[in-house]
Structure formats: structure tokens, C-alpha cells
Amino acid sequence: MGKKLLEVKDLHTSFFTANGEVKSVNGVSYYIDEHEIVAVVGESGCGKSVTQMSVMQLVQSPPGKIKSGEVLLEDKNLLEYGPRSKEMQAVRGAQIAMIFQEPMTSLDPVYTVGNQLCEVIRKHRKCTKKEAWQIGVQALADVGIPDPESRMKNYPFEMSGGMRQRAMIATAVACQSKLIICDEPTTALDVTTQAQVMEVLQSLVDKFGTSLLIVTHNLGLVTRYADRIYVMYAGRIVESGTTEEIITKP
């Protein structure tokens, strides 16, 4: 494993409702090394997704609030930046990318996949439209989409669920993100497509040295791919270790 890429220290995130404070993330700490695949697993509602939204500073405020903690990306505390700051916007996409559960809600249905991909590429890589198009085509090819040139001209509704998810992964590849946070990336897909998407994610680590953080409730899915696993329950990390330790000696 490489050096530490991301470290979260004692993170606290709460939601303030009419019935009082709900501590969704309650003192969570974890780390990810370079070129490593780490999984955060837990039941629905345990706070695993809110933890990653806090890392990206995407928690809606109000009612949510990141109360305390540190999110260190290569020793820089991201929580010192405002959610709308130029520094944080530069981190999102270029250094940390996030792939959500349902790609149809992440892709705009009225723009082609190519237009959306090129917009992100031009923002983070400062290139011409022609260069961005070529980078986008190569990114689609890298994630296993056949005939990427024509697929760039497709609208999201013209692609299958697995193909749309690959297009979202291609966005992270095109931006050369150091870390990809995958929030339930295969839940909305059938079993065969789940395996294909996971193989694509695995290939990113092997080919580009990307680090992956996989958030899921499916322990069986990550046992094949993850180097280490964190188990969350009720807003806390209750167990951590290598995949072998978690599976054989919980």
C-alpha cells in the first residue's frame, strides 16, 4: 500500500429537526491509502452515506451541519474550506469524485453524455472543446463502453443502467481523480451488471492507481474487492480490519 491519501478524524454531523438533534455521524474516523480499495458497510440509515457527503461538504444546511472533526486530504483539512469555496470546488471532481447510487439522477436527461462529460473535463483540466471530447472518448473506452465515439452523442435515457453508471465512472477517470467515493454504486443494477461495474472499478486501481471507497450494505459484494472494511452502526464505526479479518474473525 502507498502513503495515506485521505484521513477522517472524529467527524460529527447532525441534522436539526422539529423533534431535536439527530446525530447522524457520531465520531467517525477512518483512512484510505493510495492505490487501496476500502469499503464502508452497514445497514440502511447507519450514517455511511452522510459520512461521505460530509467529506465532500455536500450535506444540505439547514437542516444538516458538520459540527466538528477533520477531513485530511494529503494533510490538508478540507473542512477549513467553505462548501462553496473555490478550493472545495477544485477538490470535487479533480481530486475526489463521487459516484451515486442511481446514475439517472446524476446525469441531466436533456444533454448528451458527451456534453456533460466535456463540461466537467474542461472545468478541471483546462483544455479546448476538441481536446475535452477526445479525453471523454478515451475515458468511455477505459471503462469498457463499446463504440465510445457514438456513445458520447447518446442521451442518458438511451443507455442502460449499467452503461449510465460506467459513464459516471468515466467522468472520474477523465478528471484523473485520486479518490473515487462510490455510494452504493451497484444497488440499482442487476447481479450480472453489478459484477461488471465492480470489475471496472477494480481495473481503475490497477491501471491508474486510483483509490476507491465503496459504500454499501452488501458485505458479500465487497469481500472480493476490498483490502479493508469498516463496519458502521448508528453513526459510529463499530468494527474495522482487513477483509479477511472481518469475514473470518468478526
Protein language model regions, located:
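ABC ATPase "signature
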Residues: 240-241, 249
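A short, surface-exposed alpha-helical micro-motif characterized by mixed small hydrophobic
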Residues: 222-224
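A short, proline-enriched helix->beta-strand linker immediately N-terminal to the Walker B motif
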Residues: 174-178
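Helical segment within the ABC ATPase nucleotide-binding domain
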Residues: 195-208, 220
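Conserved ABC ATPase "signature" region
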Residues: 76-77, 131-150
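ABC ATPase NBD Q-loop/coupling interface
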Residues: 16, 70-90, 199, 245-246
